[in-house]
Amino acid sequence: MKIFVDTSAWVALENKKDTHYKEALSFKYEIKNKRYRLYTSNFILDETYTLLLANIGYEKTIEFTKIVKILRNKGLLHVIQVTEDIEDTALLIFERFNKDKFWSFTDCTSNAIMKMIDVDECFSFDRNFEQMGFIKRP
């Protein structure tokens, strides 16, 4: 099974003060047990690194970047690079749906990527993914 990991999940896993920390940790073990294939994007990691730096500090953020590197090197995490084609698709999504919603451009790139790689589950605490028609976990 495949699952896309959103910024809110990464932050919840790393920030013990996050309101979703315990829930995220519990779901992390489910991911391991069910052997999900993890996907995220360079845009998601950009957001995550910035938020972690602001909320948990430099040292812990650098530790997290090293964990990401290890997961990538072991083939446990696939980081999709947002290309110009993905950006173009994301912009169409952004323009079409934000008349009555508030989806960040990064969320729109995630939407485009998830459709491109045929992933319908997202590890996230962001309700936008349900609005987009994906299954939000946990």
List each language-model region with its residue ranges.
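Active-site neighborhoods of divalent-metal-dependent phosphate/nucleic-acid chemistry enzymes
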Residues: 77-120
